[in-house]
Curated annotation (Swiss-Prot):
Pfam families (alphabetical): EFG_C, GTP_EFTU, GTP_EFTU_D2, LepA_C
Principal location: membrane
Compartment(s): Cell inner membrane
Class of the enzyme per the UniProt entry, highest EC level: hydrolase
Catalytic activity: GTP + H2O = GDP + phosphate + H(+)
The entry's keywords: Cell inner membrane, Cell membrane, GTP-binding, Hydrolase, Membrane, Nucleotide-binding, Protein biosynthesis
GO BP: any one term: positive regulation of translation
Lineage: Bacteria, Pseudomonadati, Pseudomonadota, Gammaproteobacteria, Pseudomonadales
One Gene Ontology CC term in the entry: plasma membrane
Protein name: Elongation factor 4
CDD domains: EF4_II (cd03699), EF4_III (cd16260), LepA (cd01890), lepA_C (cd03709)
Amino acid sequence: MSHIRNFSIIAHIDHGKSTLADRFIQMCGGLSAREMEAQVLDSMDLERERGITIKAHSVTLHYKAQDGKTYQLNFIDTPGHVDFTYEVSRSLAACEGALLVVDAGQGVEAQSVANCYTAIEQGLEVMPVLNKMDLPQADPDRVKDEIEKIIGIDATDAVACSAKSGMGVDEVLERLVHTIPAPEGEIDAPLQALIIDSWFDNYLGVVSLVRVRHGRVKKGDKILVKSTGKVHLVDSVGVFTPKHTQTADLKAGEVGFIIASIKDIHGAPVGDTLTLSSTPEVEVLAGFKKIQPQVYAGLFPVSSDDFEDFRDALQKLTLNDSSLQYMPESSDALGFGFRCGFLGMLHMEIIQERLEREYDLDLITTAPSVIYELELKTGETIVVDNPSKLPDVSSVTDFREPIVTATILVPQEHLGNVITLCIEKRGVQRDMQFLGSQVQVRYDMPMNEVVLDFFDRLKSTSRGYASLDYHFDRYQSANLVKLDVLINGDKVDALALIVHRDNAAYKGRALTEKMKELIPRQMFDVAIQAAIGGQIIARTTVKALRKNVLAKCYGGDVSRKKKLLEKQKAGKKRMKQVGNVEIPQEAFLAVLRLDS
């Protein structure tokens, strides 16, 4: 056991976590040169295309150190985006240490701070590593200074390396073996293992990635899942080297997979404890705190025949991504679907794309909204995540919106633009600290403003240098109203929005203008209106296509022309009473792109 080291690699987006992982695999001979490719752990197509890590990946390698001992390294490559912090905190629970990778050119960014604090809270040993030393703009002294000032851990002897060229990587491994403590646990005690991740395989059933705390588990054992109380027979155990490799057993301190042909999707939930059926009284390990979704959106299959496939796909995806939550909902405009909860906009985009690719579905997404608290006149407090479910305004005494605390790290020259943006988004400044060449500002902002497009706008006003981390703080009263969209006098429930009263007129105008571009012209006029309660605040009209009925009249009396025009008018009027308007998918997403 003293030769096992479990650690995670944590960093901000694009600071080189996955590339460093590649070098480790290459140096320890996990894959042959033929199988090696860039970011070998990012196995999902989506991850390769976007160049980001979405799922945490686990790898077991054997490293022969300079002192002649061979160490078993179990490491987990984690995502860097704020939307996937749950993946990171789960990975950290399986480790004793973490490598904090910082880009020697960019310096410390918000996500490196946030992930590092998560690691320290969980009692891990954090070891700083300066990456990208081969870049001309690398400035190790400044960055070491930043690590000490901003994060507060000693970085005087941080290892400098370049994951791309391979320089200094062996030094990182040497230091790691000495810095990160060995796991504690007893091999002879009853089995106690924590499920860190699970996914569904069509042939094998549920595959679970576990960290064994005590005891051992081998093929043929009967394991008990503590939360369901069901017993399963283990088919195989093993590790990823990154290839799927079976081993004889998994012992205390190791991280590996267990396959027990569990066919029920909820048979082995993430964060659960496994033990042997002969020792059912083993304590449950502290799992992970259940994470609350921040953004809700409706997902509907384009054709209603796909509803059952959609439900199946969501179940399988939830097993793999336990931060996704969903419940059935129906809409007048879109039929049956699910209301899903996500951790942020990127998470929502990724989930929708995974559903469309991996499960071959066609989906329509409604505009995302956050959770609001309402206090009714009866005295009860209710939570609303869907604008179309809002009760009548007259019965509400207080409307509360979620406020997040956003921490932004930005170079001094872009500070002004960032502050202007935060004020535009109704932010209130908490504090400001000058740390070296960077400034850290903290703002309280409405979550509604942050989740939609704040991140993109922040990047563009600061030329890509600002970085953001945010977390939910509290609910606060606000002057909010529900903005309805009426098309030919009918409310379209899927287009309703909750907005601040000050922005309502502007948003209403922008939305009706946008809808006018997107709804195709019909044979009759289509009125698009935005309303708050009974008051119409904006209107545009999609003009009718009309035939020139006077084309055949040459000369002749004017009454003849009048007759033809009146006849056309009557026909259009009749059409308008019975005609209905098809709303294209783009129109539902118009709500997202209001500011652009």
